[in-house]
Amino acid sequence: MSEREYFVEMDVRSVEAYELAKEWFDEVVFTKKLILDTEPDWDSLKEELRELRRTYGKVAVLLVTRKPSLIRTFKARNLKALLYVQGGDMRVNRMAIEAKVDALISPWLGRKDYGFDHTLAGMAGRRGVAIGFSLSPLLRANPYERALTLRFMAKVWELVRKYRVPRFITSSAESKWEVRGPRDLMSLGINIGMEIPEARASLNFHPRSLLSRL
């Protein structure tokens, strides 16, 4: 299969979403979502991730936290999974990039601005921290929120392009109803200002580079 035909879905968060995404994508990453402000039981988490790797192969952990220091704690552990951080809180956004996690997902989420600036973009580019552009929050938003989010995503994309930040476009689906195929995800990229080759690379080149870390 050629580079042009190969697509990767980097973030699906349920069994049913994974099974549907596998029909449309060549590789799919199963994401274990953790909402935490204290450290987990590490032995239990490692065992759960071991089982997920046996079942799904490629696995990520999505850390949702209000405690920036927890990001460094997770980064220091050898979890044998990609480490994503849910963006939104500016302190969390900054710490995710400083700690060199694999990806910061939707740094604008829940904000009245886009949660990302030239300083963070430059740091992300140097440290190889990808920005995840997620579709699912748009599906849950009202028309005003959707328009605002698209504007924020376009602003972040300008910085990602300028500073050569790794990135990917993903459904971030928590149910099968939120899964979308490569064509729809590419359309999202084009809608926020990507050229077609840039949107394609956000489903191919950049995801595959991240997967090489596993």
From Swiss-Prot:
One of its GO terms (biological process) is tRNA 5'-leader removal. Its main location: cytoplasm. It is found in: Cytoplasm. NCBIfam families: PRK03892.1. Consists of a catalytic RNA component and at least 4-5 protein subunits. Part of ribonuclease P, a protein complex that generates mature tRNA molecules by cleaving their 5'-ends. This is Ribonuclease P protein component 3. It comes from Thermococcus gammatolerans (strain DSM 15229 / JCM 11827 / EJ3). The lineage of its organism: Archaea, Methanobacteriati, Methanobacteriota, Thermococci, Thermococcales.
